[in-house]
Amino acid sequence: MLPQYFWSVPRCAGGFLRRCIVPCAVFSLVTGASAQGGQTFDTVEVQGAEFIPEHDIQMTCGAVAGVPYLTIELRAIEDCLMSTGVFETVKLIPNGETLVIAVKEVNTRPGRIEASLSYASQDGLIGGLFFERYNLLPDTYGSVRLEYNPEVKRGSGRLYRTDVLGSDIDLGVKLGWEELSFDDSSYSKETKQIETYLAWMPSQKTRVEMGVGYRDYRLFDVDDGASALLVSEQTAGISAPFLRFALKHSSLSEGENGWGTWDYSVGIDQYFWNLGTDDSLSDFRFESRSYVPLGQMWRMLVSLDAGRVSSLDGNNATRVIDRFAPGAGSFRGFAPRGVGPHDNGDALGGNTFAVSSIEIQGNFEGLVNAPLVGGVFVDTGASWALDDTLGRAIDDGFHRRSSVGLSLAFEVGRAPVSLFVAKPFDKQDGDKEQVFGLRLSTAF
């Protein structure tokens, strides 16, 4: 639940009605408080209010002009305002003919701005800037993230409001922009996207989302010597609406990490891209994680990631910017975007992919008094199938790749670090290896 605004605070009701100033003021008028030293003010002024309307602060506990107040009654107003829970401090200060209500509000709009520097084998070294704030809009969380290096440029924004429809349905809006131009690719791509979605959590462990949005994306700057398939797939842009459906379920409760218990998580995403055009696509993605305990400090992690993209009407072909090309962190031991059909040295990706992993992990935090997880793993998978093989000139068949390696995850200060060393033992001609992989991030 996001923090609530001041106007959601109950007004002078129930038990603390006796502390509100209205009955106190009436009592003073009836008994002639002014004759006993009460002071009347011509005006009431609020100081220090940032987000709460000054009129609300005055009237919530009955601080009004023209009414005589004893000192004890001014203290009662302070107690009444403090009891609302939205102020850190409240002080009523007589200043001549003006009663000053000096307040300091509790921060109901917590947020942060941070710069970051991160490295991932997939994207390289990236500088970032992140901003988030709760109640950026009334009862609405908002965030903005920017990332940049010469090959990767990204920007994203998000608005999220809970309990839009009853107490179960939330509303979100996502905006995104990305331009990628990697040195190891013969092309560049750009995507602009906006989506509005509803989220429903039938339980604390299950989440369902349904979204509708609009996307514009393009494939450009294809090298002259690139694969003829890439040249034919070049496009100045496809702009069209899309639909998204998602289901996430996890046996893990918030704060649990999968050690010492048998747990799992599963996620399904279904996209329908480019609706209303000749390039309409179905894009299905699946992921699962299973944690099998091998004692309190050891476990087996079994994972599967898979996906398939295909034409909705069976007539149009996918493009490289639609297809899957796992590698680096998503398929350890192989270079980024490297697994799948190739032509003329270019990675083309496949319409279908699947990567599974079995990893034995040990938790060594108790030995070194710091977060430390080490493991040994075997990854295996493939990416295959094209709509156009240039007259069977391109081999798009299923060819399994496999690798074995060691992984390590720890923290340096507050910066998480994960790395692996892997060696492919089942590969195809033309595959590029990546023996060492690293991911780290630090914020300041």
List each language-model region with its residue ranges.
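Periplasmic polypeptide-binding modules associated with outer-membrane biogenesis and secretion
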Residues: 35-118, 130, 145-163, 192, ...
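Short strand->helix junction
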Residues: 11, 67, 273-275, 425-427
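Bacterial N-terminal signal peptides
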Residues: 19-31
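Extended hydrophobic
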Residues: 411
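Gram-negative/organellar outer-membrane beta-barrel architecture
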Residues: 102-254, 262, 329-339, 351, ...
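A short alpha/beta connector and helix-capping loop motif
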Residues: 390-407
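C-terminal outer-membrane beta-barrel translocator/porin domains of Gram-negative envelope proteins
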Residues: 115, 243-372, 376-387, 391-393, ...
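N-terminal secretory signal peptides that target proteins for export/translocation
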Residues: 1-15
